[in-house]
Curated annotation (Swiss-Prot):
This is Chaperone protein DnaJ 1. It is found in: Cytoplasm. GO terms for biological process: chaperone cofactor-dependent protein refolding; DNA replication; protein refolding; response to heat. It comes from Streptomyces coelicolor (strain ATCC BAA-471 / A3(2) / M145). Participates actively in the response to hyperosmotic and heat shock by preventing the aggregation of stress-denatured proteins and by disaggregating proteins, also in an autonomous, DnaK-independent fashion. Unfolded proteins bind initially to DnaJ; upon interaction with the DnaJ-bound protein, DnaK hydrolyzes its bound ATP, resulting in the formation of a stable complex. GrpE releases ADP from DnaK; ATP binding to DnaK triggers the release of the substrate protein, thus completing the reaction cycle. The J domain is necessary and sufficient to stimulate DnaK ATPase activity. Zinc center 1 plays an important role in the autonomous, DnaK-independent chaperone activity of DnaJ. Zinc center 2 is essential for interaction with DnaK and for DnaJ activity. Keywords: Chaperone, Cytoplasm, DNA replication, Metal-binding, Repeat, Stress response, Zinc, Zinc-finger. InterPro entries: DnaJ (IPR012724), DnaJ_C (IPR002939), DnaJ_domain (IPR001623), DnaJ_domain_CS (IPR018253), HSP40/DnaJ_pept-bd (IPR008971), HSP_DnaJ_Cys-rich_dom (IPR001305), HSP_DnaJ_Cys-rich_dom_sf (IPR036410), J_dom_sf (IPR036869). Residues 10-75 form the J domain. Zn(2+) 2 binds at residues 195, 198, 218, 221.
């Protein structure tokens, strides 16, 4: 892949994701497209094969945080296939480079370029970092770009009922935010000066070649482009301070233990006008003394008497947060049989509910009254000729 292709190809468009997509979103988009265009699923389809290669190439760049950062930086500098510094560069001339010539090493600047010749280098140079024009006046620099805020992860513990029905819970978080004392400037008086080392760009050259240099964050201003004359006592001149806040978070119905919920734009505030990061809420769910959960279904174990199991009847069953339901118990119901109360389970994403799975547990009495004992004794005598274990022994012999 040539450097020209690297710069000009929009890999975000290839995968169909926004430029601020998370690693998880990029991975999900890649897997979906890779399945659809895989050569094994499209035998003889040349277009699908080319598309698969393009998708894999995009994932190789965007799926690697380091490569993605360098790709974004390179596109920001050579965005539309041409590099056009402002009039402050060198003698004030405008430079128009064709990417094909530029990365071939034969680009020449227009009038007033101030002694800059062509430069060599290919994809390896781009992966090394941003290119920055050397020579000329302060106008050659570009001010530090807006920076997206960091993502935050927090945890919340819900009761079993809250997880099933949904709940709004208070969430207290601590993060770095623009310092209120100095309005994020880092200067006590709110009037920082432009860093003389980087001339406000936030970057300094770390080596040159062919008239261009690779850049690093300025060590004097820490990449901010500004220096506090009188550092703020609260943030020590950084412009950022620890901030605590409490917000009400709506947890949707039907969440499960360990589920991660993403709230866009609720993370750390961005810098220099950049967007805020995201908030990820990890949900923990307490156990319920009666009910359990199996996917969208709830479970409950209901004890029944021997007579109810043998003769059949109606059994009342509790539900979560609602009135009880009555289930008809067929005669001869064995211990451990599961019955279903439809629509009494957990809430699904489409608003419908799963079922309540009711497991029958035959209760054996520990203390029998005289009449009950006599009745069971009579039952034993009446069924003395029956052997419930006969089939068991027969099967054991035949195995």
């Amino acid at each position: 892949m040539s450097t020209k292709d690297f710069i000009e190809k929009d890999y975000y468009k290839v995968l169909g994701v926004p430029k601020d997509a998370t690693e998880a979103e990029i991975k999900k988009a890649y897997r979906k497209l890779a399945r659809e265009n895989h050569p094994d699923a499209n035998k003889g389809n040349v277009k699908a094969e080319e598309r698969f290669k393009e998708i894999s190439e995009a994932n190789d760049i965007l799926g690697d945080p380091k490569k993605r950062k360098e790709y974004d930086e390179a596109r920001a500098l050579f965005g539309n296939g041409g590099f056009r510094p402002g009039p402050g560069a060198g003698g004030g001339g405008t430079f128009n480079f064709d990417l094909g010539d530029l990365f071939g090493g034969g680009a020449q600047g227009g009038g007033g370029q101030g002694g800059a010749g062509g430069f060599g280098g290919g994809l390896g140079d781009v992966f090394g970092g941003l290119f920055n024009r050397t020579g000329g006046g302060p106008g050659t620099g570009t001010r530090t770009q807006p920076r997206r805020g960091q993502d935050i992860e927090s945890e919340v513990t819900l009761s079993f009922t809250e997880a099933i029905e949904g709940a709004t819970v208070p969430l207290r978080m601590s993060s770095q935010a623009p310092c209120k004392a100095c309005s994020g400037t880092g200067d006590k008086n709110g009037t920082p000066r432009v860093c003389p080392t980087c001339v406000g760009t936030g970057q300094v050259a770390r080596g040159s070649g062919g008239g261009f240099s690779l850049t690093d964050p300025c060590p004097d201003c820490k990449g901010r482009g500004l220096i506090a004359e009188d550092p703020c006592e609260v943030c020590k001149g950084s412009g950022r301070a620890k901030s605590s806040r409490t917000m009400q978070v709506r947890i949707p119905a039907g969440v499960s233990d360990g589920q991660r919920i993403r709230l866009r734009g609720k993370g750390t505030p961005g810098e220099r006008g950049g967007p805020a990061g995201d908030l990820y809420v990890v949900v923990h769910v307490k156990e319920h003394p009666v009910f359990g959960r199996r996917g969208d279904n709830l479970t409950v174990t209901v004890p029944v008497t021997y007579a109810e199991a043998a003769l059949g009847g109606e059994v009342r069953v509790p539900t979560l947060g609602g009135p009880s339901v009555t289930l008809k118990l067929p005669a001869g119901t064995p211990n451990g049989r599961t019955m279903r109360a439809r629509g009494k389970g957990a809430v699904r994403k489409d608003g419908t509910r799963g079922d309540l799975l009711v497991t029958v547990e035959v209760s054996v009495p520990k203390d029998l009254t005289g009449k009950a004992r006599d009745a069971l004794q009579a039952y034993r005598e009446a069924t003395a000729d029956e052997d419930p274990r006969a089939e068991l022994f027969q099967a054991a012999k035949g195995a």
